């Protein structure tokens, strides 16, 4: 059985995390040549490339498996050794989360964990349709995803759903929808998407108004909080989680443009198995809080 030296695995991990050999060398306090040598040792051991040497570098499929192994070992070492290993540096937990969860329920859910445990969070924001891929690649140890099926050697639990409403300011509605929300009016109403792969707005309009994808003008803004600001100032109409705009809806600052119509996205918590003690506490915190504030019934659509 091929057993990698974990020092060489840490070099591979540093190159991926730091997005290059030079910064990885600085992080590890060794020379860039030493980083290259350690990775070459790994590649010789396994007889195949572990890095695609692009800018930034990315792991091959075998590299992804080794990174996942490293992260599991680090968590299990923490469980067995605890604070007896003489290292005062808080444990780094890399998690892949969607922007809307981060803007609404995730941080309150993690509050007791952050208060009780010596950990450092590395929250990597990604669309909920793609967070599981970061777990597959070994970039993170846990992911909030819409995928219900676990990856091999992983665990999954249902967290609950976010309900998305199609909202805008009253002034925006009066300007663009004076006769109600119609297909022709929607074609002229500015909207917003998180990135070019975010299809929630388009999917909602296609499902409920038979509008083809790409037919509605969309701003691209990589911020969940900015969606709320854009809607409040009357710039766009957009899909926003109900949980994020309860006060604005109650005050009338924002209005639901299509009462009775919504998008429900069920979220699931994925992580490696077996769980370390720390990850078990993270899981318990996320499941407990998520089940308090997220919808638990079956989702309506994606």
Curated annotation (Swiss-Prot):
GO terms for biological process: regulation of DNA-templated transcription. It comes from the Bacteria. PROSITE patterns: HTH_LYSR. InterPro entries: ArgP, ArgP_gammaproteobact, LTTR, LysR_subst-bd, Tscrpt_reg_HTH_LysR, WH-like_DNA-bd_sf, WH_DNA-bd_sf. GO terms for molecular function: DNA binding; DNA-binding transcription factor activity. The keyword Transcription applies. The keyword Cell membrane does not apply. Keywords: DNA-binding, Transcription, Transcription regulation. Pfam families: HTH_1, LysR_substrate. Residues 21-40 bind DNA. Residues 4-60 form the HTH lysR-type domain. Transmembrane segments: none annotated. Homodimer. NCBIfam families: argP, PRK03635.1, PRK13348.1. Controls the transcription of genes involved in arginine and lysine metabolism. Belongs to the LysR transcriptional regulatory family. PANTHER family: HTH-TYPE TRANSCRIPTIONAL REGULATOR ARGP, TRANSCRIPTIONAL REGULATOR. This is HTH-type transcriptional regulator ArgP. It comes from Yersinia pestis.
